[in-house]
Amino acid sequence: MQDVKTYLSTAPVLATLWFGLLAGILIEINRFFPDALVLPY
């Protein structure tokens, strides 16, 4: 169990989880608020 916890705390695994979570959040924001990056003038 200690080896699994050591593996899950390595940088590539944490980076993959972080970027996956960030991508999911951005996708959901764009799903509910589309075209938020375009200023409506």
UniProtKB/Swiss-Prot annotation:
Membrane-crossing residues?
Answer: 7-27
Q: Gene Ontology terms, cellular component aspect? A: chloroplast thylakoid membrane; photosystem I
Q: Which GO terms describe its biological process?
A: photosynthesis
Name one matching Pfam family. Answer: PSI_PsaJ
Keyword vocabulary terms for this entry: Chloroplast, Membrane, Photosynthesis, Photosystem I, Plastid, Thylakoid, Transmembrane, Transmembrane helix
The yes or no answer to whether the keyword Nucleotide-binding is present is no
Q: SUPFAM superfamilies under this entry?
A: Subunit IX of photosystem I reaction centre, PsaJ
Where in or outside the cell it occurs: the entry states: Plastid, Chloroplast thylakoid membrane
* Membrane topology per record: Single-pass membrane protein
Q: Where is this protein chiefly located?
A: plastid
User: What protein family is recorded?
Assistant: Belongs to the PsaJ family.
Q: What does this protein do?
A: May help in the organization of the PsaE and PsaF subunits.
HAMAP family linked? PSI_PsaJ (MF_00522)
Name the record gives this protein: Photosystem I reaction center subunit IX
Q: By which gene is this protein encoded?
A: psaJ
